[in-house]
Amino acid sequence: MNLAKNYALNYNPIDTVENLFSAQSYELDRRDENEVVVEVQGKWNNMLLFFAWEENMHCLHLSCLMDIKSTIEDRSKIFEMLALANEELWVGHFSYWTEQNMPVFKHAVILNDNEANVESKIAQVIDIAIKECERMYPIFNVVLTKGMNPRQAMYPKMMETIGQA
């Protein structure tokens, strides 16, 4: 059963991504018609944002890489950290890029031709990715480079939530 209508976009959302970042004087690497990469200055470190457009699915994918190279051998700590981080998310998820030994935030959005405010929607997805990476960077850093127990590393974040109740 296919409930999705067959929409054909009249544009490529990668162009919108390119326009959003170009307007703020960011350097972009347009790898091909459906991919672009941009490096943004973060609070803790630079982040690499990778965008890919999948035409058949009408899906714009965003990966935001945090430049934290893991030095720990115990992968169970890494995956426990990812699970704890993902429990707090409403959209997107954290993953681990094993080839580069670093965490990555991923999110995808379906874009149809008849949608209004596509630029605003894309900007919102970018903001969410950057904010989530900024929020979790210190925690990922102490787990991946110092070997701290993931639950201990998350404790200050849990206290923030309790303090706001």
Model-found features: residue ranges?
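Charged, low-complexity intrinsically disordered regions
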Residues: F94-I130, E134-G147
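Amphipathic alpha-helical segments
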Residues: Y7-L28
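Short, intrinsically disordered, mixed-charge
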Residues: A23, E80-E88, D127, K131-P138
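Short, internal acidic amphipathic alpha-helical interface segments
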Residues: L65-V104
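Short histidine-centered catalytic/ligand-binding loop motif
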Residues: K5-N6, S63-T71, E115-V118, I122
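Short, highly charged C-terminal tails/helix-capping segments
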Residues: N141-A165
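Ser/Thr-rich, low-complexity intrinsically disordered terminal regions
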Residues: Q24-M47, F51-S63, D67
